[in-house]
Amino acid sequence: MSKYVDRVIAEVEKKYADEPEFVQTVEEVLSSLGPVVDAHPEYEEVALLERMVIPERVIEFRVPWEDDNGKVHVNTGYRVQFNGAIGPYKGGLRFAPSVNLSIMKFLGFEQAFKDSLTTLPMGGAKGGSDFDPNGKSDREVMRFCQAFMTELYRHIGPDIDVPAGDLGVGAREIGYMYGQYRKIVGGFYNGVLTGKARSFGGSLVRPEATGYGSVYYVEAVMKHENDTLVGKTVALAGFGNVAWGAAKKLAELGAKAVTLSGPDGYIYDPEGITTEEKINYMLEMRASGRNKVQDYADKFGVQFFPGEKPWGQKVDIIMPCATQNDVDLEQAKKIVANNVKYYIEVANMPTTNEALRFLMQQPNMVVAPSKAVNAGGVLVSGFEMSQNSERLSWTAEEVDSKLHQVMTDIHDGSAAAAERYGLGYNLVAGANIVGFQKIADAMMAQGIAW
């Protein structure tokens, strides 16, 4: 590894020892950039990496709101505007009790590289709050969203920072936040948020985008390996929008998802989650707020494994779609023992660094990184921004076609970058290199301003 890269990683580990998720993602990204950094000694001369691992701006604020009983609660809100060298900040808002500064910085850092990979002019950001929408009434969620936007509005704009949804933030929450934004600023600037309802500027295919895009990426991997999706079995984790979109597109292309997981365990459906009834039931489960994947097992009479993860099932493809660090070294060893060939990260950083290194050492396994695989979500968000700017609405076929093409290009570009630096078919390193190079070029061209 490059001495410069080693030094910056060591500095980050020391300075941010209390931010483990952020340190983990910095280590994962920078550790693959040695060949690029060594080829450009000018990067060290202008402290490029040191600047790149520090956000351009971190906004932290209190969010007071009142519940239905008149009791006042206070949550913490965040917006980490990590890197805007190539365009307005772009990235989701997450409402979950687990939200903290380390997770926001990790997601913002990853987002910068992901947005760069899309080829669209978007910088990287992430935000959210430790507010838990589960168990709250619709009015309570509305009041919280309004309180959150009452502070956030001053930091965002169509050409400044364009938030979107993420875990705990769907079209409902985006709608409430946009309503408050419109009231405060006094104008119809619908390009300020993406993930909106169709009635006021949302894009077709946005709910399915991350899942669809992940499968299009797998399709490109299959083409490279002279293989096909037809007949493949897939283990999915999660049962939200991403897993739903993936299951839907897998079925359409002739493969079948056979697992889903939740906080309570996982289900195994050997016949596959391929029918319209089963795929639509995933949406019903999520909308119920019960957060139990066992409901699927009860309805369709399949096996449920309480408190377990699906990584011990023998399948062709693994696609973790749930949350960060879902696959540790122990789980990775189970995956390898089952001779799984394709390990496709879909959730943000779903694999511990230790497990990722182990999987990448397997000679017969293809490992694909989340920042490339799940780029479809932010890609269609970028398409939504374009439609809002043009005052036009694209057809579903047009959006899907563009999504398919760009996801294929992301795979092909990553593979080519890895080959160019003598790394073989290393999609993890290739994605990091491509994402980094565009940001680095922009930062170098703009001088030492950030």
UniProtKB/Swiss-Prot annotation:
<dbReference type="GO" id="GO:0004354">
    <property type="term" value="F:glutamate dehydrogenase (NADP+) activity"/>
</dbReference>
<dbReference type="InterPro" id="IPR033922">
    <property type="entry name" value="NAD_bind_Glu_DH"/>
</dbReference>
<feature type="binding site">
    <location>
        <position position="241"/>
    </location>
    <ligand>
        <name>NAD(+)</name>
    </ligand>
</feature>
<comment type="similarity">
    <text>Belongs to the Glu/Leu/Phe/Val dehydrogenases family.</text>
</comment>
<dbReference type="GO" id="GO:0006537">
    <property type="term" value="P:glutamate biosynthetic process"/>
</dbReference>
<feature type="binding site">
    <location>
        <position position="165"/>
    </location>
    <ligand>
        <name>substrate</name>
    </ligand>
</feature>
<protein>
    <recommendedName>
        <fullName>NAD-specific glutamate dehydrogenase</fullName>
        <ecNumber>1.4.1.2</ecNumber>
    </recommendedName>
</protein>
<dbReference type="GO" id="GO:0004352">
    <property type="term" value="F:glutamate dehydrogenase (NAD+) activity"/>
</dbReference>
<dbReference type="GO" id="GO:0005829">
    <property type="term" value="C:cytosol"/>
</dbReference>
<comment type="subunit">
    <text>Homohexamer.</text>
</comment>
<dbReference type="InterPro" id="IPR006096">
    <property type="entry name" value="Glu/Leu/Phe/Val/Trp_DH_C"/>
</dbReference>
<dbReference type="InterPro" id="IPR050724">
    <property type="entry name" value="Glu_Leu_Phe_Val_DH"/>
</dbReference>
<feature type="active site" description="Proton donor">
    <location>
        <position position="126"/>
    </location>
</feature>
<dbReference type="GO" id="GO:0019552">
    <property type="term" value="P:glutamate catabolic process via 2-hydroxyglutarate"/>
</dbReference>
<dbReference type="InterPro" id="IPR033524">
    <property type="entry name" value="Glu/Leu/Phe/Val_DH_AS"/>
</dbReference>
<dbReference type="Pfam" id="PF02812">
    <property type="entry name" value="ELFV_dehydrog_N"/>
</dbReference>
<dbReference type="GO" id="GO:0006520">
    <property type="term" value="P:amino acid metabolic process"/>
</dbReference>
<dbReference type="InterPro" id="IPR006095">
    <property type="entry name" value="Glu/Leu/Phe/Val/Trp_DH"/>
</dbReference>
<dbReference type="InterPro" id="IPR014362">
    <property type="entry name" value="Glu_DH"/>
</dbReference>
<dbReference type="InterPro" id="IPR036291">
    <property type="entry name" value="NAD(P)-bd_dom_sf"/>
</dbReference>
<keyword id="KW-0560">Oxidoreductase</keyword>
<comment type="pathway">
    <text>Amino-acid degradation; L-glutamate degradation via hydroxyglutarate pathway; crotonoyl-CoA from L-glutamate: step 1/5.</text>
</comment>
<dbReference type="InterPro" id="IPR006097">
    <property type="entry name" value="Glu/Leu/Phe/Val/Trp_DH_dimer"/>
</dbReference>
<feature type="binding site">
    <location>
        <position position="111"/>
    </location>
    <ligand>
        <name>substrate</name>
    </ligand>
</feature>
<dbReference type="InterPro" id="IPR046346">
    <property type="entry name" value="Aminoacid_DH-like_N_sf"/>
</dbReference>
<keyword id="KW-0520">NAD</keyword>
<dbReference type="Pfam" id="PF00208">
    <property type="entry name" value="ELFV_dehydrog"/>
</dbReference>
<feature type="binding site">
    <location>
        <position position="381"/>
    </location>
    <ligand>
        <name>substrate</name>
    </ligand>
</feature>
<feature type="binding site">
    <location>
        <position position="114"/>
    </location>
    <ligand>
        <name>substrate</name>
    </ligand>
</feature>
<feature type="binding site">
    <location>
        <position position="210"/>
    </location>
    <ligand>
        <name>NAD(+)</name>
    </ligand>
</feature>
<feature type="site" description="Important for catalysis">
    <location>
        <position position="166"/>
    </location>
</feature>
<feature type="binding site">
    <location>
        <position position="90"/>
    </location>
    <ligand>
        <name>substrate</name>
    </ligand>
</feature>
